[in-house]
Amino acid sequence: AQRTPAANIRNWCLARARHLDGSLDATRFNTHRINKRQILSGPISSAVSILRVLLEPTRAEGIDTHIAFNFSQGQKAGLHIRNCVAVPTDGSSATNSISCELAVWADILSGSTTLSQAIAASVLQIDGNTAHALRALDCFDVAGLRS
């Protein structure tokens, strides 16, 4: 970090080193915060594809699950979790599907509610192999999906 001319990299490396040695508490910077308004105002595809960068590869080992997300007005997106990566798709030929309103999905991603609460309230339905879908969604660094 001390030898690179790139200020952003240097600052990131120094802040990370200080966090690791205990002289700086940077845990709040390592928490992903998803804003409900951003999910609701953006395209449907981004409401699902945002998860691709939140996958924890070690938790996704051995998973090969394709999930379609069906939202109101026939809007659809998909995510295929395989080889420890999440690949956005259009949802066609998915073996599992999740159906809910976009607002419910935004609540789950933003932490206002959890996946299990949405299922219990019957505002979200999973078709196909529920256990595989839940295990795949548990691989993401989103508190609302780990329930």
What is the meaning of each model-derived region?
Residues 2-147:
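Feature captures hydrophobic
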